[in-house]
A protein has these predicted regions:
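N-terminal Rossmann-like dinucleotide-binding module
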Residues: 35-125, 435
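Hydrophobic residues in well-ordered beta-strands that form the structural core
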Residues: 83, 174, 199-201, 311, ...
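Rossmann-fold dehydrogenase core element
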Residues: 187-205, 224-228
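Predominantly a Rossmann-like dinucleotide-binding segment in NAD(P)-dependent oxidoreductases
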Residues: 90, 205-291, 409
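N-terminal secretory signal peptides and thylakoid transit peptides that target proteins
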Residues: 2-20
Length: 436
């Protein structure tokens, strides 16, 4: 190879823009004829702009531009979280999600199991003196690194832990369902407001890209008006000893655990509140798993816009998590809608004389990292969370209406949460920015 054509690393760095026309000995006319104009930042090394590293789009018009590189905050500037409760969800999903978070970090643990907490702390580099028992809120309060707590205990313990966190002056991210009753949820909202701390309910699907795209498409009117919605979330359950089958700890069975995703998902999709609810509950007899809680629930909601939503949930079926939106000129089918991962969206609509079925390709993101970063951003910018306590309170009220409708066999009249008004998304904070 001729020395004139050998590109060294020094030449590449000196050229700044990578394989520019100058480096290849090409004139300006040749460059213009062979491709798009030179980018405003170096093609291969990128540049720092507004505190971020940016690269120009290196693909041609036939492909979508790649996303920008991640821009995590320095660890010392991220919001420190204490995880309260070290069960399956914390250990399998939430703690690993901090590795993908950009604005949040885990700095403390609270658990009733000292051995488990000690081992987990060692695995995640958490100091031994930042590990607490459930009766050590005063010690946690004194830890300045803890700005927020994530409550991941059984549902029946949410109220007490949220009140303790608020009393400690810590912002609160609480798992769903918010509580065991609307009265408890109301108390939690009031306690956090009085303490001047933020309260967010962990409705992860409202932050997940595919669910957000369904909401965007449904509300855009691109495929006409939404007329009907179907939502189903079901799975089998075993181990009669687990806390989810004990009413005092769970508050109910399939409905508050997994059926809540259908209820909240439809509300978030439409941005309005139902006006009436009908429901049925079926629980197998002589099954010791369901001595205290229900197995299967079907409920129908009618909305002011005329939309009818048919929802179902069960602890007795093969895993299925589906959301389907029917509009006047199309349909949106979200497979694995409420799962931790694996979402797939199909959009059907008329295209001339035939039906077109599209599958938008979106970037899958860790839902727990997304909600952690949203809470962190709300703390850093003093912003109301998208899914605040009022969002969880309204769901508690509506679930009580579902149980009442099933018990009486009669429709139950419902409406907006008191004090929130009649507007769209009345129980929610500001809309999420696109791409976040």
């Amino acid at each position: 190879m001729s020395d004139d054509l050998r590109l060294s690393r020094r030449l590449l760095l000196a050229g700044g823009a990578g394989l520019t026309g100058a480096a290849l000995g090409l004139g300006a006319g040749a460059r213009a004829a062979s491709g798009p104009p030179a980018p405003s930042v170096p093609a291969d090394t990128g540049a720092v702009q507004d505190g971020r590293i940016v690269f120009p789009n290196w693909r041609d018009d036939g492909d979508a531009p790649p996303p920008p590189p991640p821009a995590p905050m320095p660890p010392s500037e991220r919001v420190g979280f204490a995880i309260v409760g070290l069960g399956r969800l914390s250990l399998e999903e939430i703690l690993p999600a901090f590795g993908e978070a950009k604005k949040a970090r885990v700095v403390a643990l609270m658990s009733g199991s000292a051995d488990k907490a000690k081992l987990t702390a060692a695995q995640y580099g958490i100091p031994a003196d930042a590990v607490y028992g459930y009766d050590q809120w005063d010690r946690l309060k004194a830890n300045p690194a803890v700005k927020a707590v994530y409550i991941v205990t059984p549902n029946g313990l949410h109220r007490d832990n949220v009140l303790a966190a608020a009393g400690a002056g810590k912002h609160v991210l609480c798992e769903k369902p918010m509580a065991n009753s609307s009265a408890e949820a109301q108390e939690m909202v009031e306690a956090c407001a009085k303490a001047g701390v933020k309260l967010m309910i962990a409705y992860r699907c409202q932050y997940e890209p595919f669910n957000r795209e369904v909401v965007r498409l449904a509300r855009s009117g691109e495929f006409g008006r939404v007329k009907m919605v179907e939502a189903f979330n079901g799975q089998t359950t075993g181990l009669p000893e687990q806390w989810r089958l004990r009413k005092a700890l769970a508050g109910g069975g399939a409905l508050p655990d997994i059926g809540l995703y259908c209820l909240n998902g439809v509300r978030a999709l439409l941005g309005e509140e139902p006006v009436s609810i009908q429901a049925q509950i079926v629980t197998p007899e002589n099954d010791r798993r369901f001595k205290e809680v229900e197995e299967s629930v079907a409920f129908t909601m009618r909305f002011p816009s005329g939309v009818i939503a048919q929802c179902g949930t069960s602890y007795g079926v093969h895993e299925s998590r589906e959301l389907r939106v029917h509009t006047t000129s199309g349909s949106l089918d979200l497979h694995n809608a409420f799962a931790y991962r694996g979402q797939r969206l199909t959009v059907a609509h008329r295209e001339g004389s035939h039906v077109q079925r599209d599958e938008p390709v979106l970037t899958h993101k860790n839902q727990f990292a997304l909600e952690l970063d949203h809470m962190a951003e709300c703390i850093l910018t003093d912003r109301r969370p998208r899914t605040p306590g009022e969002e969880g309170l309204q769901d508690m009220i509506l679930m009580e209406a579902i149980y009442a409708a099933a018990r009486t066999g009669q429709p139950v009249t419902v409406g907006p949460l008191a004090g929130t008004g009649q507007g769209t998304d009345a129980t929610r904070g500001p809309a999420l920015e696109e791409g976040k």
